[in-house]
Regions:
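ATP/NTP phosphate-donor binding region
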Residues: 1-84
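Glycine/threonine-rich beta-strand-loop-alpha-helix active-site module
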Residues: 68-131
């Protein structure tokens, strides 16, 4: 018998983004696809958090990102030392963000308390795995 456990909490529904208002006094890094940078959707998400937190945006995301993009993301992250990472985008964005968070914790000993994925496409499943 095989057993698989993925300790992922999933929030879905029209008000699920409101959970972001629960963050207080955090350094939040939002990693998103470049086309979202000036979108009303991203403005809305930032508005849920920016009055109580320091929010920084990183958009150097490419499809099927090579490890060099993960390294660049870690280098960017070192300057802001986020306590929360939010990935907004498709599978490539979410996977790259998970790599940045993982190596930031393991190699740079950053205190990243929360990783949140907000998928903008369906089908990848990247938001439900920790790897």
């Amino acid at each position: 018998m095989n057993k698989w456990t993925f300790p992922t909490q999933i929030y879905a529904g029209p008000d699920s983004l409101n959970r972001l208002t629960e963050f207080n006094n955090e350094s939040i890094l939002i990693i998103c696809d470049p086309f979202l940078k000036d979108s009303p959707s991203l403005t809305y998400v930032i508005g849920l958090m920016d009055s109580k937190n320091k929010v920084t945006i990183y958009t150097d995301v490419v499809p099927d990102p090579p490890i060099t993009h993960v390294v660049k993301g870690i280098e960017f992250m070192e300057g802001i030392k986020p306590t929360v990472i939010i990935a907004i985008g498709g599978g490539s964005c979410i996977d790259m963000s998970k790599g940045i968070a993982y190596f930031g914790r393991k190699l740079k000993h950053m205190d990243i308390k929360s990783f949140i994925a907000v998928p903008t496409t369906s089908g990848t499943g990247s938001e439900v795995t920790s790897f």
